[in-house]
Amino acid sequence: MRRLLLIWVIASCCPAEPAKPAATTSARGEPRNQATPEERHFKDLKQITFGGDNAEAYWSFGGDRLIFQTNHKPYKCDQIEMMPANGGPAKLISTGKGRTTCSYFLKGDQEIIYASTHESSPECPTPPDMSKGYNWGLFEYDIYKANADGSNLRKLTGAPGYDAEATVCPVDGSIIFTSERSGDLELWRMDANGGNLRQLTNTPGYDGGAFFSQDCTKIVWRASRPQG
């Protein structure tokens, strides 16, 4: 999951809610151009986050904001922040508790979703062992919906285990995500309110990281198929 340690912008493309810690910013410095003289593909390549690991950034439907996960200080593990697409100050959107991942705007940009472990435990889960290479932790994530400022937090999934990697259909706002509720990591789809849950894949191995096509008639996703 954490394939990028910096977020880059291509300028030519376009229950009770827990208390939050004070809002902080991960943009510690002015956006700066990172294109080298040898660059042939990107017209304007800028670094817009500074400090910590910043990843899984997604555009608002209006193209004016980015939502992403970050572990810059003072966070002990990933939290969700939002910032203007031009790299302005970022604001904490998640609860500041547990670990979060995979945030996304809902259609209309008035609400967002993300996965979090904060109801399982307010503490950061133990990181996976990376001594033998990259390993994505299958923590006790559930998927939550909130207003775009992080208020009015509602839980959409409640099955034991891993529910995360959610993205949104731009047509009807339905959500596709990865879950291990069936005993394997499969793709599931639900309505924007968490209802009408149905399983989309049923093949041994990992299925995740799914995205809808623009008209939501197709999906693309990552898959691994163990042999033997």
In which residue ranges do the predicted regions lie?
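Sequence signature of WD/YWTD-type beta-propeller architectures
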Residues: 17-228
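Sec-dependent N-terminal signal peptides
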Residues: 3-12
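Basic polycationic patches enriched in arginine
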Residues: 2-3, 28
